[in-house]
Regions:
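Compositionally biased, low-complexity flexible segments
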Residues: 272, 277-292
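Structured interaction and signal-relay segments at domain junctions
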Residues: 35-72, 76-81, 185-188
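Extreme N-terminus nucleophile/cap motif
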Residues: 1-59, 201, 243-246, 252-265, ...
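Conserved beta-strand-loop-short alpha-helix elements that form
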Residues: 2, 103-113
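Catalytic core of PPM/PP2C metal-dependent serine/threonine phosphatase domains
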Residues: 73, 147-187
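Short acidic (Asp/Glu) patches
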Residues: 52-64, 78-100, 117-120
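A conserved acidic, glycine/proline-rich C-terminal tail/linker
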Residues: 200-243
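Glycine-rich phosphate-binding loop plus the immediately following alpha-helix
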Residues: 113-115, 119-144
Length: 307
């Protein structure tokens, strides 16, 4: 399968160190050799690089590795194709507009039958099941709210929709609007939060060490999420399948386990003329999938501090 990398920080931070470890897995230390991509948020803007070449041999990847683009939210992906041809249009992450913000999505896994789920205005450019799932997810959010809701209900709804998609197979997801970084674990995902006192770390995939005490200030908070831990001498938190952690300004929110609230009709359709909140569906909006809310069992709050 593919591999994911995400970052959330409270100050603009470069991801060169973690990205150096990830791209080695794109055809050198692992077989994810069917393209790669990375997206950096700079204010409301989103700067993205994609290449269908293996990241370990990509000149574009080497440029990104050596150019310290500073961002508070980053999403990256290296691909091992299983749905859709190897091509630029099928490289993650994918980006679309919702509520006046650029939303970015990357996925690891396979989703059987997701292309039978109907879509509205959002349409895939490529042929992956991942991009179809992204379009479907954004349509459900757009159908429910005219503008971005507050953080807590948005977290619950993203988690519920991710759990519905996870019913179709393997669904590990990074999703962001540049403010929140939603990380859903279907099978494998790990994260680490770095904050003062900072220390050194060494990559698993390359003999490269960074001393974060020389690269940060005492107030910095940086969280990194990856399919597999990227460093060998730090303690990473391995997520439980079916759980989601949301990061804001580098700080992990309470981890929650999600399951879809409805079991009827996995096509993503509602009954005619109904919205998920029970009211009439707005004219011209895409259909919704599921009934109000979701069932979420809370786990203990995650501990802050250097890991």
């Amino acid at each position: 399968m593919c591999e994911l990398l995400g970052m959330s920080a409270n100050v603009p931070t470069d991801i060169c160190f973690s990205f150096a470890g990830l791209i080695r897995r794109g055809g050198q230390t692992a077989h994810h050799a069917d393209g790669w991509g990375i997206a950096f948020y700079e204010g409301k803007g989103c700067r993205a690089f994609h290449d269908p070449a293996p990241s370990a041999r990509s000149e574009v990847a080497q440029f990104v590795r050596g150019y310290p683009i500073r961002s508070r939210v980053v999403v990256s992906h290296i691909r091992r194709a299983n749905r859709g041809r190897v091509g630029l249009e099928n490289t993650h992450p994918f980006t679309r507009e919702l509520w006046g913000r650029a939303w970015t999505f990357a996925h690891n896994g396979q989703l059987r039958g997701v292309k039978r789920w109907p879509l509205g205005p959002y349409r895939p450019v490529g042929t992956t099941d991942s991009e179809h799932a992204f379009c479907w997810l954004l349509e459900q959010l757009r159908a429910r709210w005219d503008r971005r809701p507050s953080d807590a209900p948005l977290r619950r709804e993203v988690g519920r929709l991710a759990a519905r998609l996870a019913e179709l197979g393997v669904f590990n997801m990074l999703l962001t609007d540049g403010h929140s970084l939603f990380c859903f674990c279907g099978s494998k995902l790990a994260w680490i939060t770095r904050r003062a006192p900072f220390g050194p770390a060494t990559l698993v995939d390359e003999d490269l060490t960074a001393d974060f005490s020389t690269l940060t200030t005492p107030d910095d908070v940086v969280s990194v999420v990856a399919t597999r831990p990227l460093t060998r001498d730090e303690t990473w938190t391995v997520m439980t399948p079916g759980s989601m952690v949301t990061f804001q300004d580098g700080v992990p929110q309470t981890e929650a386990r999600h399951r879809p609230s409805d079991q009827a009709g996995r096509s993503g359709k509602l009954g005619p003329g109904r919205r998920r909140d029970g009211g009439p569906r707005r004219s011209g909006r895409p259909g919704s999938a599921g009934s109000p809310g979701g069932s979420i069992s809370r786990l203990a709050p995650l501990k802050d501090g250097a890991l």
